[in-house]
Design a protein with these regions (language model features):
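An acidic-aromatic substrate-binding cleft motif
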Residues: 36-38, 42, 59-106, 124, ...
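Short, acidic/polar
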Residues: 76-92, 157-169, 237-247, 338-347
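Aromatic-rich peripheral "rim/lid" segments of glycoside hydrolase catalytic domains that contact
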Residues: 34, 180, 185-218, 274-286, ...
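Beta-strand-rich domain onsets/edges
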Residues: 16-76, 109-110, 135, 149, ...
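Noncatalytic carbohydrate-binding groove/subsite architecture in carbohydrate-active enzymes
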Residues: 74-85, 89, 197-320
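Sec-dependent N-terminal signal peptides
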Residues: 3-13
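Substrate-binding cleft and catalytic face of glycoside hydrolase catalytic domains
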Residues: 93, 97-111, 118-227, 233
Length: 385
């Protein structure tokens, strides 16, 4: 019995090591990919008679994939010079879709926007040239706004400003076909959310549900042909399912349900069954499913959200004092990131209801919350992922 204990105990420790990823079973994933992501086709070529008698070589190249393999471009606007160009080159090696941050605080019509406007124009021109599809994120949110919006006292004037802002984004950037309409729609009144007048406007309209209906109806009155979607940080929140079900019942015109998955603490790392069951739960609503913001770090994860918050508070204080406080990328967690993402992408890609996966940070440079959440190091050299 003593020897059996010595055999089992190390195995238990190894299995509980948060840097170890036990490979997923992925039962049926390969077959589903063959069925839903590939197809047979017949190409007919009509040549003049004189050419038919000649031998030649035909080269066929896949220009793009229907599935959207994405990255969040929130880091790109902070890149300069050669780093900017290298970032885009690295992006093209694996991705065909990008989420462009268009938060109201960046696109504020009451401030000088020349630099950010040029950035957007340059990205759109580049995306057209390189067959990259874009998503604008978001048209409206209860965070990331200028102070004149946050502390607005006249709710009728605020409503005009909100609708003017959403119209301006849709009409100014017609090349962008995908838009997150209202980011995190069941989140405005969560305890951790800071005050904004948009919360007052939501109450003024009768609550979250009627306010969201009005927003969706408005953006569709501006342009009904866009791919409108929503997005939330916890798709497992039953309120998020309920509001999407309500949208469907109201016959609102939207194409996709967005799910975030920022796995920066051990309790947020999704298992194979959790990922699959979450997709299946939402698939019954008949909409495309987008994994909109994925983070799998190669830095040491926190045990839980409380530990994570303590770090974020210290990091915020450090940044206020002009000092960076980023978590280092560690070899054992780089192994985890690579093996976990291989399984995650395989499983999600195999489900016919999923239309996109967007990895939030391409690089550790300026990565969200200071985690080593990129697929590239800060110098833009690749990790194992």
């Amino acid at each position: 019995m003593k020897y059996l204990f010595y055999l089992i105990f190390p195995l238990l420790i190894f299995a509980q090591d948060p840097s170890f990823h036990e490979p997923w079973k992925l039962e049926g994933a390969g077959e589903r990919i063959e069925k839903y992501r590939k197809t047979n086709t017949i190409l007919n070529f009509n040549f003049p008679t004189d050419i038919k008698k000649k031998n030649g070589k035909l080269k066929i190249k896949l220009i793009n994939h229907d599935f959207k393999f994405g990255v969040g471009f929130t880091q790109l606007r902070k890149m300069r010079g050669n780093m900017f160009d290298l970032y885009l080159e690295r992006f093209k090696e694996a991705f065909n879709y990008a989420t462009v941050g268009m938060y109201w605080v960046l696109t504020d019509e009451r401030s000088s926007r020349k630099q950010i406007d040029k950035y957007y124009d340059d990205i759109i021109k580049w995306s057209i040239k390189n067959n990259v599809r874009l998503k604008g994120h978001p048209l409206m949110w209860h965070e990331g706004m200028p102070d004149w919006v946050r502390y607005s006292k006249d709710l009728d004037e605020l409503e005009v400003a909100m609708k003017t802002h959403m119209r301006r984004l849709i009409e100014t950037y017609p090349e962008i076909n995908d838009w997150d309409v209202y980011n995190e729609p069941v989140g405005p009144f969560k305890p951790h959310i800071p005050y904004s007048a948009i919360q007052d406007w939501i109450n003024y309209k009768g609550g979250i549900y009627p306010a969201m209906v009005e927003i969706y109806q408005f953006v569709n009155s501006v342009n009904p042909d866009k791919n409108y979607s929503n997005n939330h940080y916890h798709a497992k929140d039953p309120e998020y399912f309920k509001i999407n079900e309500y949208y469907v019942q109201k016959n609102l015109n939207f194409s996709s349900i967005g799910m975030q998955a920022h796995m920066q603490s051990n309790d947020n790392v999704m298992t194979e069954s959790q990922v699959w069951d979450q997709i299946e739960d939402y698939a019954v609503l008949g909409k495309n499913i987008q994994f909109t913001e994925i983070t799998v770090t190669s830095s040491k994860r926190f045990n839980n959200w409380k530990d994570h918050q303590e770090f974020l508070a210290k990091r915020d204080e450090s940044l206020r004092n002009g000092k960076e406080m980023d978590l280092p990328s560690l070899p054992e967690y780089e192994d985890f990131q690579a093996s976990y993402l291989k399984d995650f992408y395989t499983l999600v890609f195999s489900h016919p209801s999923v239309s996109s996966i967007t990895f939030w940070n391409l690089t550790d440079k300026n990565a969200w919350r200071g985690h080593a959440g990129g697929l590239l190091y800060k110098d833009l050299s690749p990790k194992k992922s």
